[in-house]
Amino acid sequence: MKYLNQQEAISIDEELFNEYKFSVDQLMELAGLSCAHVIADAYAPESNKILICCGPGNNGGDGLVAARHLALMNYNPYVYYPKRTEKELFRNLQHQAESMGITVTTDCPDGASVEQEFGLIVDALFGFSFKPPVRDSFLPIMNVLQRSKLPIVSIDIPSGWNVEEGPQNECDIQPACLISLTAPKLCAKRLLNAQHYLGGRFVPKRLEEKYSLELPSYLGSNLFVKLN
């Protein structure tokens, strides 16, 4: 199976949109749904809430979709979404989550309350377009994630990591689980003792062959594959 560099990941996304005529909301819904299924496979529902940290881009959109589906699966998601966008897609995703009774807040939770109130953290802050360093407005939540003892599930890229080189310093988060989308990125080779899943079951065979992705086979109707 091929691990993608940043430009390859961007190019594949562009081909999905332009050559194969997928819409952003189509792929986001499929990606977020697969993330919810991975979390349901790896972590049983608990009384504690799931803190889902969403960034301003498509990675954050995946998190908003996952929150909605997790609520339908009897989990208790709580969304931290500090930097909003005026794009209709993201406004709709937020509205859908809130309409289902999910709290979506701009208030950064403090470390102590996170440890007391939550049982799991989903990191949907930055995707494969990210280039360090982390912007100042996201430093508070990154500090919470770096210090937390709770398991962290990262969507596609552990936030703060270089997409190709992985963690840049010893303070970067180390997720307990990574959900790679479409295909793993090079940074996934730097995971330490983490569960690794592949989600996003939407890659056309012709596109897979063009980039020599050699994706693993999905079992039956599953939306994910466990890679380790």
From Swiss-Prot:
Enzyme class name: isomerase
Domain spans labelled YjeF N-terminal: 9-215
One Gene Ontology cellular component annotation held by this UniProt entry: mitochondrion
Entry annotated with the keyword Isomerase: yes
UniProt: K(+) binding residues: 59, 123, 159
Cofactors demanded by this protein: K(+)
Disulphide-bridged cysteine pairs: none
One Pfam family of this chain: YjeF_N
Cofactor comment: Binds 1 potassium ion per subunit.
Substrates-to-products reaction catalysed: (6R)-NADHX = (6S)-NADHX; (6R)-NADPHX = (6S)-NADPHX
Annotated keywords: Isomerase, Metal-binding, NAD, NADP, Nucleotide-binding, Potassium
The organism's place on the tree of life at top rank: Eukaryota
InterPro entries for this protein: YjeF_N_dom, YjeF_N_dom_sf, YJEFN_prot_NAXE-like
Sequence positions that bind (6S)-NADPHX: 58-62, 127-133, 156
MF term (GO), any: metal ion binding
EC number: 5.1.99.6
Secreted keyword on record: no
NCBIfam families on file: yjeF_nterm
Cited function: Catalyzes the epimerization of the S- and R-forms of NAD(P)HX, a damaged form of NAD(P)H that is a result of enzymatic or heat-dependent hydration. This is a prerequisite for the S-specific NAD(P)H-hydrate dehydratase to allow the repair of both epimers of NAD(P)HX.
Family: Belongs to the NnrE/AIBP family.
PANTHER family named among the record's database cross-references: NAD(P)H-HYDRATE EPIMERASE (PTHR13232:SF10)
Protein name: NAD(P)H-hydrate epimerase
Source organism per UniProt: Anopheles darlingi (Mosquito)
